[in-house]
From Swiss-Prot:
Belongs to the class-II aminoacyl-tRNA synthetase family. Phe-tRNA synthetase alpha subunit type 1 subfamily. Mg(2+) binds at residue 252. Its cofactor is Mg(2+). Pfam families: Phe_tRNA-synt_N, tRNA-synt_2d. The keyword Metal-binding applies. It comes from the Bacteria. Keywords: Aminoacyl-tRNA synthetase, ATP-binding, Cytoplasm, Ligase, Magnesium, Metal-binding, Nucleotide-binding, Protein biosynthesis. This is Phenylalanine--tRNA ligase alpha subunit. It is found in: Cytoplasm. The lineage of its organism: Bacteria, Pseudomonadati, Pseudomonadota, Gammaproteobacteria, Pseudomonadales. It comes from Pseudomonas fluorescens (strain ATCC BAA-477 / NRRL B-23932 / Pf-5). Its EC number is 6.1.1.20. The keyword Amino-acid biosynthesis does not apply.
Amino acid sequence: MENLDALVSQALEAVQHAEDINALEQIRVHFLGKKGELTQVMKTLGNLPAEERPQVGALINVAKERVTEVLNARKAAFEEAELSAKLAAECIDVTLPGRGQTSGGLHPITRTLERIEQFFTHIGYGIAEGPEVEDDYHNFEALNIPGHHPARSMHDTFYFNANMLLRTHTSPVQVRTMESQQPPIRIVCPGRVYRSDSDITHSPMFHQVEGLLVDRDINFADLKGTIEEFLRVFFEKELAVRFRPSYFPFTEPSAEVDMECVMCSGKGCRVCKQTGWLEVMGCGMVHPNVLRMSGIDPEEFQGFAFGMGAERLAMLRYGVNDLRLFFDNDLRFLAQFR
């Protein structure tokens, strides 16, 4: 039995010096496997007298159990250490600083539209909306632009077929409002419009805000005062404003509105092409034909209308020189307007 005690001591020492689970497995096979040292000792029982076999067999089983117990304990220690290391690697260190969440903000075009709407609703205008897919009648015919009219060449239109198109302005909303509502009418019509044009100052899709007022005894002075006050409030400064005679099929008389350049205060710069003036919108008195086709008597009621591009006003207010920047979805650009 001295040989048995020596094998157990060797096994326990080997287990103690094992460096990992793979080493423990090799030790198990060496001592407890089918051809292991302790297994071979068990096979020698047949060489012993019958009366000694039970006692020796019991001693061998105790030795095997002892080695197995130490192996399992050592293996459990390795597994626990491995699990602890894995959990430590995967845990979240709550003492580290957080990544932080940047707050979002409204898009500059949305800000501009809200600013325009806020002014006009404050002075009694309502907000009107209409379809972006429009018919030819409301986009052109009802606005005094018949099929043969040369003004149609001013609109690079996206047509679906001969009668349906993407609206080129929000004026059809004014027509639909006049068809369904009797004067007095005071509305602004913000929305997306579409024209086949793309460069640093034009986009195939852009936002337009048009306004309409129809009532008795309305004249150009009312229009002029409304626009001058709007520009003063929108740009938050006193600006010189001028009205240049122009032509639109749906207004008569018509005018282009220029204001003092916000970049150079009228001194002349690259933005205003050294003129000191910037064009900001078109306007005019509603043409009698437009009122008549909408079911309103032009002898009793008069009206004025105006239209402006939201992108154009945003470019001037924020000093942006390329309209396409508004639609590039570049967070570095948009973050400036939070």
